[in-house]
Design a protein with these regions (language model features):
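Conserved active-site and cofactor/substrate-binding residues in soluble primary-metabolism enzymes
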Residues: 3, 27, 31, 48-52, ...
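General beta-strand structural signal in soluble alpha/beta enzymes
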Residues: 17, 43-46, 72-73
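Rossmann-fold NAD(P)-binding glycine/threonine-rich loop
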Residues: 6-14, 19-42
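Short Asp/Glu-rich motifs
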Residues: 27-28, 55-56, 141
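Active-site-lining helix/loop region of Rossmann-like oxidoreductase modules
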Residues: 63-183
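Short Gly/Thr/Asp-enriched flexible loops that form oxyanion-binding sites at enzyme active sites
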Residues: 4-5, 60
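Gly/Ser/Thr-rich loops at beta-strand to alpha-helix junctions
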Residues: 21-25, 47-54, 78
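Alpha-helical support elements that line or immediately flank enzyme active sites
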Residues: 52-64
Length: 183
């Protein structure tokens, strides 16, 4: 919530968050800048994927290449070892029906950060990306019972998900792709 963050900043509290705000690009951040000035505070957006490795590896590795035609960064995670059952069940919607998972807010929620990652990579590598971001969400269901931190995921219920976002360049897909896959 940008207004809540602005209030915290204006009150003099520094804010460090893994939720967005690591590459504002062309977004209007004047309210946040004013709040930082008023509170003599700072806002630091960071993360691993996105907000860290997603951008830094492609940019770092690009120095070893003479021409870059596309960039793809993906994260894979195994929920069987993820220590946050409420996140797995209530937010990521594992163990739910495919229809329930299709209504997940995760595409939008995660997409805000991944879009910033794509914009940073595009800007630094000189790609002139189109304004539209194409997002995707695929689910796979268990074919056998799977033991997980939320209990057994029964056959027919969501056991894997793939979220993806991509920027097109002059209408061409697959130039800059970011993804998050968990199973």
């Amino acid at each position: 919530d940008p207004q809540l963050v602005a209030r915290l900043l204006a009150s003099g509290k520094n804010v460090v968050t893994p939720l967005n705000w690591f590459y504002p690009g062309k977004r209007d951040v004047s309210a946040l800048e004013q709040a930082c000035e008023a509170g003599n505070s700072t806002l630091h957006g960071t993360g691993i994927h996105p907000g860290g490795i997603t951008e830094r590896f492609p940019l770092m590795i690009s120095a070893l290449s003479s021409a870059i035609t596309h960039v793809r960064a993906e994260e894979f995670s195994d929920i069987r070892t993820y220590g946050a059952p409420a996140v797995i069940s209530d937010i990521m919607l594992f163990g739910k029906t495919p229809e329930e998972a299709a209504a997940s807010p995760m595409v939008h929620f995660l997409g805000q950060g991944f879009q910033q990652s794509m914009e940073m990579v595009a800007a630094e590598m000189g790609f002139a990306v189109d304004a539209k971001v194409i997002s995707g969400h695929e689910v796979a269901v268990a074919t056998a019972p799977i033991d997980s931190p939320i209990g057994i995921i029964e056959p027919g219920l969501v056991a894997a998900q793939r979220f993806s976002w991509q920027h097109t360049v002059r209408g061409v897909r697959g130039i800059i792709v970011m993804g998050f896959e968990s199973a």
